[in-house]
Amino acid sequence: MSMSVQGAIAANRFGLGAKPGEIEAASVNPRTWLKQQLQAIEFNDGLASSSELEIALAEYQRDRKRAKKMADVKNPSVQFGKSAQKMSIAVAKRAIDSNVSLSWRLLDFFSNHFSVSSSGRTMVALAPTLEREAIAPNLDQRFEQMLLSVVRHPAMLIYLNNERSFGPNSLAGKRGRGLNENLAREI
């Protein structure tokens, strides 16, 4: 098989960098090769969902308060950080080893577009789930669908402080706690 400039461009510019044999494969028909790259991204099934992580975070906060009362010197936040780091490494390895690097490149692009800060335990845990639960499943959908999925995701709601936002006609809204405009500014 021979290599072409178009094949090299397809494999390098639209993916995560060519792996051995990819330039040759893309050179046969670069457009077809790129279209074949647009497949659903598979994540490790063992990764926790945002719902599971929210429960774990609540339990962590409860245990932390108990430990403080009992003057326990263990630091559970160290273990929490290690789990988040392991999850990031696992996702990066999966992207590198994948045969659909264009899909991973698009995921990276939209993850940067809809970025959330991962400061604080809650966001360290939830930020990666935004990618898996709201962005990746919508890569082949209309942008509007992805946007709606992202803005309704717990990580984005917490990042923009919208989990504390109330409608103007709700009981909380009538007490002066109304809508949070952070989301509107971001969009």
Residue ranges and their predicted role:
Residues 1-187:
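A contiguous strand-loop segment
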